[in-house]
């Protein structure tokens, strides 16, 4: 069945363009990192952009086994998962395309026949903008020199996330067997949050409303928790995804590992499964992420820089907490004792 073009196609394109212009008029803040910032492994999108001038590709191969108990079918699915990300105009703004091209072989056990399908299962283009940066203040990125606990133990304030907004569209081109009768273009909106629970644990959440205005709109959520080991090149993650739609609903679990080969190159492996049997799903995927780093730090004119306050050298004028004050006093006492011990032999020698 040929894909239908919705009447609201011009409005959808105008909406995306207007949103991009709105974001481009907002103030920028550095999002660039020295190490590649990849959404792989897993499906969750982090709140942060790749950085202005950075071109990043994230690709992987996957295989999935689906068995449907009611339809009495078995399916083998294989394909390519690809995402292209570009830091556009601002440090906070990112242009994001993602697509999944897959082949599916369906065996109808009752009829003893087979069917083969192949096309884009996902084809999206959108923009993501970091609306609120929890660590915009550089003081929050600095370690507490007076308290080991403050640096390594979970604090409730760490749950306050950075927040990003995503707006884009799905594209169904030609006679796509996975979406018969689906409009050519349908909007997609998402809110992404990212919290640094501890220096090694990061929590990411996504809430998305997809295929808006179609016969099968879809709500979904993602919760992903990642952990970096003592060797920071290695990290693991666990992820929960929920999907609610008249076409398909399920709850999925994923878990895997990532390895940083170089600052611009990462490899990953993950597997997962669903909870339902209509269909049951078991899958495995492996991929890489690579970036072309053309980022350049912007020079801020001196007249645009913040003035230096009289207390800027003392925690930027911030009053120390009780715990920080106690830790500071203990550190000062230890330093005084150490100085007295060092000066005592010199006095005896005189």
Language-model region placement:
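Sec-dependent signal peptide hydrophobic core
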Residues: 13-20
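Short stretches within intrinsically disordered, low-complexity N-terminal or propeptide regions
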Residues: 4-5, 20, 29
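Glutamine-centric residue-chemistry signal
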Residues: 14, 29-31
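Transmembrane beta-barrel domains of Gram-negative outer membranes and organellar outer membranes
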Residues: 31-212, 216-258, 262-270, 275-350
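N-terminal secretory signal peptides that target proteins for export/translocation
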Residues: 1-12
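Functionally engaged cysteine thiol sites
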Residues: 7, 17, 52
């Amino acid at each position: 069945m040929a894909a239908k073009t919705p009447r609201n196609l011009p409005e959808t394109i105008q909406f995306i363009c207007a949103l991009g212009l709105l974001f481009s008029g907002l103030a920028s803040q550095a999002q660039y990192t020295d190490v590649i910032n990849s959404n792989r492994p897993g499906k969750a999108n982090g709140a942060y952009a790749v950085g202005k001038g950075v071109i990043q590709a994230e690709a992987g191969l996957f295989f999935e086994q689906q068995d449907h108990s009611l339809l009495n079918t078995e399916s083998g699915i294989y394909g390519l998962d690809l995402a292209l990300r570009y830091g556009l105009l601002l440090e906070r703004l990112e242009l994001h395309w993602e697509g999944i091209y897959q082949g599916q072989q369906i065996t109808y056990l009752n009829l003893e026949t087979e069917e083969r399908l192949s096309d884009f299962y996902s084809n999206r283009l959108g923009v993501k903008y970091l609306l609120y940066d929890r660590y915009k203040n550089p003081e929050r990125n600095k370690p507490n020199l007076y308290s080991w606990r403050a640096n390594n133990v979970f604090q409730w304030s760490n749950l306050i996330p950075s927040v990003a907004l995503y707006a884009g569209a799905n594209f169904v081109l030609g006679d796509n067997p996975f979406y018969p009768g689906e409009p050519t273009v349908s909007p997609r909106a998402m809110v992404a949050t990212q919290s640094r629970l501890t220096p090694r644990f990061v929590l990411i959440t996504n809430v998305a409303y997809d295929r808006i205005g179609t016969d099968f709109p879809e709500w979904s959520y993602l919760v992903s928790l990642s952990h970096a080991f003592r060797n920071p090149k290695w990290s693991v993650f666990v992820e929960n995804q929920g999907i609610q739609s008249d076409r398909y609903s399920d709850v999925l679990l994923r878990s895997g590992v990532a390895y940083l080969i170089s600052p611009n190159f990462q490899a990953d492996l993950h597997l997962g499964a669903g909870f339902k049997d209509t269909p049951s799903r078991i899958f495995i995927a492996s991929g890489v992420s690579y970036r072309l780093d053309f980022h350049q730090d912007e020079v801020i004119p001196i007249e645009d820089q913040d003035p230096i306050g009289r207390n800027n050298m003392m925690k930027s004028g911030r009053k120390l907490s009780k715990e920080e004050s106690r830790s500071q006093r203990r550190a000062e006492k230890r330093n005084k004792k150490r100085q007295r011990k060092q000066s005592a032999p010199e006095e005896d020698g005189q």
